[in-house]
């Protein structure tokens, strides 16, 4: 007797779910975009100096012209290793790499959530500095990584 009652309750609750209807209504959406923004392509210049293997040695620089309606700019490693640190990896031997950080023209470390104060049409250069402690021989080769340029639009 208990089995039959349980089955009837299950069937009764199944039937009530099958009859559920969804009421929908469309609402119009309208928005205005007031400013166009076109990010300029930055110029990336590798360093060919002898100090690349030293801590703080210049590895490469990123230069750009600040577009209109921008108050801050930041440049940071796409694959952030540890709080703003990137890794340049030798394309011929991935066991060879260089840890680096990017700083603005005043030497402040750049991160993705804050940038350097700028004015429109200003030329600004960010520097990628060797963050590996001590002096280290860096074998010649092509070292790759990716950086992101962030613009804070007014």
Swiss-Prot record:
Chief place of localization: other
Protein name: CS6 fimbrial subunit A
Signal peptide: 1-18
Name of the encoding gene: cssA
Location of this chain's protein in the cell: Fimbrium
Keyword Manganese found: no
UniProt-listed InterPro entries: Fimbrial_Assembly_Comp
Chain's role: Fimbriae (also called pili), polar filaments radiating from the surface of the bacterium to a length of 0.5-1.5 micrometers and numbering 100-300 per cell, enable bacteria to colonize the epithelium of specific host organs.
